[in-house]
């Protein structure tokens, strides 16, 4: 059984909440576009800022009308039917304009979509009509982008392969950052296993303003009977000299010295941010690539949960440090479902 340490409430009280997107419709019964910006770190209050942008909207296909062959068919605008919802992450750039200018430029984008497959199902985005506010992102938009389908589409199986598909942007999520760099723990360091070490993981508990059961995300009841969601992230490992005994108090003392501050952002949907304002050991600092601010996008940790809650209100209710023995190197990781005898798979 693992030992835990609960961080004080003030560690996530200030920026541990994300407000919901207002899902309102206009006279045409279409969703009214909206932009939602949150701050992470210490971004400037005015002027130039570093902004990470995620576009949210609907996948649509042209409606099949009657083949009348009249001249009006050439002048009437094509109507579309929704076949799914999803997102398009366009990344970080230095932005000079206003929120409303950015929203207008995003909803004016003409985005065509194609569903394909490599080692897994993918969604290909091709972008046109890039206006001035989006010029800081123009290089990656013009090149086209491809993403794991399960990360950016709520139901990729609903996207037809024999029809034209467009992605209509309705909402824009933005994360205003204090730096142009979003630091993530490299996979090689996150998978690091050292002898005589303790793995420090964080159990993050959330309260979401949306019912998730019908979409396959089962909540957990807390002590008060409230429905909560949770996920885990790996912070790093604590290592002591051979022969030294790890006590719970020793681990807690290490964590308290870090003075961790937690916040929620909108990188890739919902993102969890950790900022160390205290002292870290050299071992832990090296695992965090010598960064004191780290981002954990839920899109990478739990894609399905992210898809379900990315438009809702989300609040951190608690964060616990979980102290567990590091997994020995001898343990084998099997990323594939099909394995023969000891897990070896013959590759073509």
Swiss-Prot record:
Bridged cysteine pairs (disulfide): 251-295
GO-annotated cellular components: viral envelope
Keywords linked to the UniProt accession: Disulfide bond, Viral envelope protein, Viral matrix protein, Virion
One annotated GO molecular function: structural constituent of virion
Highest rank taxon of the organism: Viruses
Entry's localization field: Virion
Gene3D superfamilies referenced in this protein's UniProt entry, alphabetically: Viral matrix protein, C-terminal domain, Viral matrix protein, N-terminal domain
GO annotation (BP), single: virion assembly
Pfam families: Matrix_Paramyxo_C, Matrix_Paramyxo_N
Purpose of the protein: The M protein has a crucial role in virus assembly and interacts with the RNP complex as well as with the viral membrane.
Family: Belongs to the morbillivirus/respirovirus/rubulavirus M protein family.
Protein name according to UniProt: Matrix protein
């Amino acid at each position: 059984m693992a030992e835990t340490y609960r961080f004080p409430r003030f560690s996530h009280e200030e920026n541990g909440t994300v407000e919901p997107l207002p899902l309102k419709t206009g006279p045409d019964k279409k969703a009214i576009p909206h932009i939602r910006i949150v701050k992470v770190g210490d971004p400037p209050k005015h002027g130039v800022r570093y902004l990470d942008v995620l576009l949210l909207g609907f996948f649509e296909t042209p409606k099949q009308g009657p083949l009348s062959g009249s001249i009006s068919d050439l002048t009437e605008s094509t109507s579309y039917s929704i076949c799914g919802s999803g997102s398009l992450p366009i990344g970080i750039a230095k932005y000079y304009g206003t929120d409303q200018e950015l929203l207008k430029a995003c909803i004016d984008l003409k985005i065509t979509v194609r569903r394909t497959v490599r080692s897994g199902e993918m969604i290909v985005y091709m972008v046109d009509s890039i206006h001035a506010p989006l010029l800081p992102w123009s290089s990656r938009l013009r090149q086209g982008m491809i993403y794991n389908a399960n990360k950016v589409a709520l139901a990729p199986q609903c996207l037809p392969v024999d029809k034209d598909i467009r992605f209509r942007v309705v909402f824009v999520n933005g994360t205003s950052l204090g730096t142009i760099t979003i630091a993530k723990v490299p996979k090689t360091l996150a998978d690091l296993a050292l002898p005589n070490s303790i793995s420090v993981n964080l159990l993050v508990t959330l309260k979401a303003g949306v019912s998730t059961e019908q979409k396959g995300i089962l909540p957990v009841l807390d002590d008060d009977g409230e429905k909560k969601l949770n996920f885990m992230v790996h912070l790093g490992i604590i290592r002591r000299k051979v022969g030294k005994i790890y006590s719970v108090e020793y681990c807690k003392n290490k964590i308290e010295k870090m003075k961790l501050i937690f916040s929620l952002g909108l990188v890739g949907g919902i993102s969890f941010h950790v900022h160390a304002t205290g002292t870290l050991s050299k071992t832990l600092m090296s695992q965090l690539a010598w960064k004191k601010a780290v981002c954990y996008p839920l899109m990478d940790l739990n894609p399905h949960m992210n898809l379900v809650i990315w438009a809702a209100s989300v609040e951190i209710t608690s964060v616990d440090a979980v102290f567990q023995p590091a997994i020995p190197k001898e343990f084998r990781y099997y990323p594939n479902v099909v394995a023969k005898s000891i897990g070896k798979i013959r590759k073509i």
